[in-house]
Amino acid sequence: MNKLIETLASLNLSGADTKIIRLDENSYKLESNYGYNDSYFQYDVHYYDWMTAEVDVDGNIFSAVRKSGSEFWNGGGEMSEERVVNFGDPEWKLPNEAKEAVLKNANKILALQVGEFVEFDRDGNHKIEYISASAGRIGLQK
């Protein structure tokens, strides 16, 4: 397996929507974000987990930040909890089940030109984009 794809797959979060951008001839950026709302008793809760990372074409991690936490609120006040972890070790791997989403898109990722990106959901399916009337077309485009 290509080391770049293996590293991007290791950084991808379970359950997340992911965007991989070709920054320049030597690097890629991964944005993997997941969040959901829940409620119990009198509280509303928002849970989130996101990863932003830059990786070179050889699969070495330049930088990676994982931020996760939760926000609670009700009529009487708010609480929040957040954890931030910074990574710079080229051998670091995030254990998760989300690798298949990146592997499914390996050919698209490797074909990216500078400034291009590919976006996919937690199952690795290409995201549907909305086209506005100003673009001359209205509706959904795959």
Region locations from a protein language model:
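Generic N-terminal leader/processing signal
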Residues: 1, 17-20, 65, 97, ...
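Acidic, low-complexity, intrinsically disordered interaction modules
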Residues: 27-135
